[in-house]
Amino acid sequence: MTLNGVYHIAKIGDIIYSLPAVYLRGGTKYYKIKREGVCEYLKPLLEAQPYIGRVEYSSNGNDCELDFSNYQALYKLYLRGNLTYMHLVCAGIRAHHFPLKISKLSLESEHLSYGNVEIDLNTHRDTLIWSDEKPWLTNIEPKHVADIIINITDRYHDWKNLGSKEHDFRSFDYTLCKDYDCGFIGLDNEYQLFVDRYKFEPKFIRVSDALETAQIIKGSKLFVGNASSAKAIAEGMKHPTLMEISKTYPDCIPMHKHGYHFISKELVEHY
């Protein structure tokens, strides 16, 4: 049965990772998003999905049947590895192959709590399982701009500020892409940081919304990047992906047969 509303308080990528749970719960008549800018960016992409009605900005989800505010509780409890599965748990769907790992809580019963948020694990719908190979972003026309689309943010790269002696990304070498037709999607400052760090200049691509981002990624042969909204879109389409992950916080591990959490010349050439 179609949900009477879904509400989310988080950022672009988190909302994209929530969509399999929305799909398995029967879709929704409307999806409300707390952040206005995030809402406007995502609206064309989300409304293109057959299981989502309208998308709108709202400061609260009081009238929504499914509220993902408790998603933050799972994140803080260190249920890490895949954000899609974390949303499935929030929606009362047991992710059978999600390793439920809790490092900051002694789980005495099938019940989680964090602050004023409570999640009853007994409500899981065991018959609902999401296939790792099933795309949840569809109805997207490919738009070819470059063979390889790159998007990285400075997320986890501020290692000096975090008191770390080592940068746990050093083994991921973006320069392996430099001899190919590459485009970079992202903010101006992200592009400049990339150029300064890796010493080559892919074409800079500006986009108007998430739907255009999806079209450009789908029109490419390969997506290369880190934990970002563009990576979430690539994951939602099950597009070939080489992903730079944090060994400390591996939140967005690719979960399909064309997703890799390392880069090599052989993989770049293969795609």
What residue spans do the PLM features occupy?
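Catalytic machinery of carbohydrate-active enzymes
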Residues: M1-Y271
